[in-house]
Design a protein with these regions (language model features):
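Conserved AMP-binding A3 loop
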Residues: 38-62
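Conserved AMP-binding/adenylation subdomain of ANL enzymes
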Residues: 61-78, 86-127, 141
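AMP-binding/adenylate-forming catalytic core of the ANL superfamily
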Residues: 128, 220, 236, 241-242, ...
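Conserved pre-ATP/AMP-binding loop-to-beta segment of ANL
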Residues: 10-11, 23-42, 49, 72-78
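Structural core segment of the AMP-binding/adenylate-forming
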Residues: 1-21, 27-32, 331-333, 358
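AMP-binding/adenylate-forming core of the ANL superfamily
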Residues: 215, 226-240, 259, 265-266
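Conserved S/T- and glycine-rich ATP-binding loop of Class I adenylate-forming
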Residues: 37, 43-46, 79, 85, ...
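Gly/Ser/Thr-rich phosphate-binding loop
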Residues: 117, 122-130, 139-200, 213, ...
Length: 382
């Protein structure tokens, strides 16, 4: 292991500037092919250890071609990037997309919901990408009601399923969501829901972009018809080359026909719109019934007392797994399991209702805003 300092020398550390000055100069020109690896972007690690996805120059280019066609991007846009650049959404959804079209880029160091609201108004931002949690926290600020959002064409939302209540809330401010679905391994976008479909296809992640294919398969990798739930598989020039130093994981993720197996559960409707149900690994099996946490979370988010919610499955002697709701409450609010079950009863089948409730100050999240459910399970297990 090597430690480098860029500011001053320290005992046992190597000085980066000194070594760089002594190094042989790079070749003036380097030949680059679209199949060459451009970056190694690590997955978010929400279900375990992150893996390094090798993304090529072609992957990045085709992602931005797909995004530009979907968003109708132009050089007149003002793009705000607040998602971290080590996250594929922060780097390749908006930032490289802005370079691609030559638009104005507002680049923030970190996410502060009050600062973001101020900058949306100050710079007359037209597009912003964020995780649902970011837009949720923004909406919870007192400044939200008075912020001028009239310049916004689209808020692009990804990284997790978007609660319908959040879509409806921003709709009251005249702001449209362009929901997207994708993964680090897909550079990332693999589906778009543009504003004209926001009402009629509410809850959908959209359609595959022009240069990408999507299909749903069963456990035996057989394609499923519209309306049936299965694993979402993706193919196109935006799919990664493989995982860095993980040929085993690459072979497991990308089949011989070039389909990337996402590990996400979803279905396509009759019109080819993709609906995301949940991660396969997050699915709870309670009493032999499959429960998709995202569905339960979407309902619970509508409860007036709940600020944040995550649903996980915890071991249970009777049911195998117990549907467990972990919530952070709005200030001054109280909530009991009995009250929550009674409130949610009209909206969820009985087997989907939480059997346990844990109230916390905040949910554990990674820097991209995704809830770390494996951390939650570890904490609850302790």
């Amino acid at each position: 292991r090597h430690f480098f300092s860029s500011e001053s020398e320290a005992d046992g550390w190597r000085h980066l500037a000194t070594e760089r000055a002594a190094a042989d100069p790079l070749e003036a020109t380097v030949s680059v092919d679209q199949h060459d690896v451009a970056i190694i972007m690590y997955t978010s690690g929400t279900t375990g250890l992150p893996k390094g996805a090798m993304l090529t120059h072609g992957n990045l280019l085709w992602n931005n071609i797909n995004a530009s066609l979907a968003f109708g991007s132009s050089r007149d846009d003002v793009i705000l990037t607040v998602a971290p650049l080590f996250h594929i959404g922060g780097l390749n959804v908006m930032t490289l997309g802005s370079f691609h079209t030559g638009s104005t880029l507002v680049l923030l160091r970190n996410f502060d919901p009050v600062q973001v609201l101020a900058d949306l108004e100050r710079y007359k931002v037209t597009h912003m990408f964020g995780a649902p949690a970011m837009f949720l926290f923004m909406s919870q600020q007192p400044q939200f009601a008075d912020t001028d959002l009239s310049s916004i064409k689209n808020l692009i939302c990804g990284a997790a399923p978007v609660p319908e209540s959040l879509i409806e809330l921003y709709g009251t401010r005249g702001v449209d969501f362009c929901q997207g679905y994708g993964l680090t391994e897909t550079s990332p976008f693999s589906a778009f829901l543009t504003p004209e479909w926001a009402v009629s296809k509410l809850g959908s992640a959209g359609q595959p972009p022009l240069y990408s294919d999507t299909r749903i398969v069963d456990a035996d990798n057989r394609p499923l018809p519209p309306g049936e739930r299965g694993e979402i598989c993706l193919r196109g020039p935006n799919i990664m080359k493989g995982y860095w130093n993980r040929p085993d994981a690459t072979a497991e993720a990308i089949d011989k026909e070039g389909w990337f197996h996402s590990g996400d559960v979803g279905y396509l409707d009759e019109d080819g719109f993709l609906f995301i149900c949940d991660r396969l690994k997050d699915m709870v099996i309670s009493g032999g019934e499959n429960v998709y946490p995202a569905e339960v979370e979407g309902v619970l988010y509508k409860h007036d007392a709940i600020a944040e919610v995550a649903v996980v499955g915890m071991p249970d002697e009777k049911w195998g797994e117990a549907v467990t709701a972990v919530v952070a409450l709005h200030e001054g609010q109280d909530l009991t399991l009995e009250d929550l079950r009674e409130w949610a009863g009209p909206f969820l089948a009985k087997y989907k209702l939480p059997l346990r409730l844990h109230v916390v100050d905040a949910l554990p999240r990674n820097p991209a805003g995704k809830v770390l459910k494996f951390v939650l399970k570890e904490q609850l297990g302790e």
